[in-house]
Amino acid sequence: MPLKLKVNDAVATVDVPPDTPLLWVLRDVLNLKGAKYGCGMGVCGACTVLVDGRAVRSCMTHVGAVVGQAVTTIEGLSPDGLHPVQAAWESFDVPQCGYCQAGQIMTAAALLARTPHPTDAEIDTAMSGNLCRCGTYPRIRQAIHEAAGAVANK
């Protein structure tokens, strides 16, 4: 049975079983490669996307569960240029290997949408489910603080 999804403000109809992981639909059906497969168990955060503004692990979310909700991937985070979090990521040279970055950025964007001026503790709590094998955590925190001002002024 075809499922109608709203992904990055566009409607897409996909013909997959409703228990298919959202990550596979995004990557293999819709050709949106930003969200990455890391662990397949929802613990690394590389596959994080937004569903109605909430950060979710797309490897553990069935596509049928997001019908009627807005899915945003890194490709759709800011269609008119860089989102403030993306700009701050560049400014603070956060990426090294880059594998985790889409998930990190999506989690940070969700945090700033609900907590415009987070403390270090709030950042650490929100980002704790996103692993970075390169260890750029201090730069991630700095970038989120930098982006907070830009997001609040948007």
Set out the residue ranges of the language-model regions.
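Signature of N-terminal electron-transfer/Fe-S-associated modules in redox systems
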Residues: 1-154
